[in-house]
């Protein structure tokens, strides 16, 4: 029962991280990033940033 609870808690934490925009540990889809930035008349690129031993994949518009 404890293992199930731990797995459930970890799943909720990871799901919460994936839903937050900005600096989160997530996958960046290049085509979605370009579409998002095209609306701002900019070029989009997936960038990896490292902060406190975490790697963040985020979309940047240039």
Swiss-Prot record:
Keywords: Disulfide bond, Ion channel impairing toxin, Neurotoxin, Potassium channel impairing toxin, Secreted, Signal, Toxin. One of its GO terms (cellular component) is extracellular region. Disulfide bonds join 28-46, 33-59, 37-61. GO terms for molecular function: potassium channel regulator activity; toxin activity. Its main location: secreted. Residues 1-18 form the signal peptide. Transmembrane segments: none annotated. The keyword Cell inner membrane does not apply. It is found in: Secreted. Expressed by the venom gland. May block potassium channels. Belongs to the short scorpion toxin superfamily. Potassium channel inhibitor family. Alpha-KTx 23 subfamily. Has the structural arrangement of an alpha-helix connected to antiparallel beta-sheets by disulfide bonds (CS-alpha/beta). This is Potassium channel toxin alpha-KTx Tx790. It comes from Buthus israelis (Israeli scorpion). The lineage of its organism: Eukaryota, Metazoa, Ecdysozoa, Arthropoda, Chelicerata.
């Amino acid at each position: 029962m404890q293992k199930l609870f731990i797995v459930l808690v970890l799943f909720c934490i990871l799901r919460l991280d994936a839903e937050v925009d900005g600096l989160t540990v997530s996958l960046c889809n290049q085509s979605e990033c370009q579409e998002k930035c095209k609306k701002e008349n900019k070029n989009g690129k997936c960038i990896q940033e490292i902060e406190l031993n975490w790697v963040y994949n985020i979309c940047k518009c240039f």
